[in-house]
Amino acid sequence: QSSFHSWG
């Protein structure tokens, strides 16, 4: 299980 978050 993996989670990815990106803020620009």
Swiss-Prot record:
Which terms under GO biological process does the entry name? Answer: neuropeptide signaling pathway
Question: What compartments host this protein?
Answer: Secreted
Q: Which GO cellular component terms, listed alphabetically, does the Swiss-Prot or TrEMBL entry include?
A: extracellular region
Which keywords appear in this protein's UniProt record, sorted alphabetically? Amidation, Neuropeptide, Pyrrolidone carboxylic acid, Secreted
This protein's record includes keyword DNA damage: no
**Chief location category:** secreted
Q: Which residues carry this modification: Pyrrolidone carboxylic acid?
A: Q1
Record PTM Glycine amide, positions in chain: G8
| Summary of the function given for this chain in its UniProt record | This cephalomyotropic peptide stimulates contractile activity of cockroach protodeum (hindgut).
Protein name, UniProt field: Leucokinin-6
Whose protein is this, by species?
Rhyparobia maderae (Madeira cockroach)
What are the top taxonomic ranks of the organism? Eukaryota, Metazoa, Ecdysozoa, Arthropoda, Hexapoda
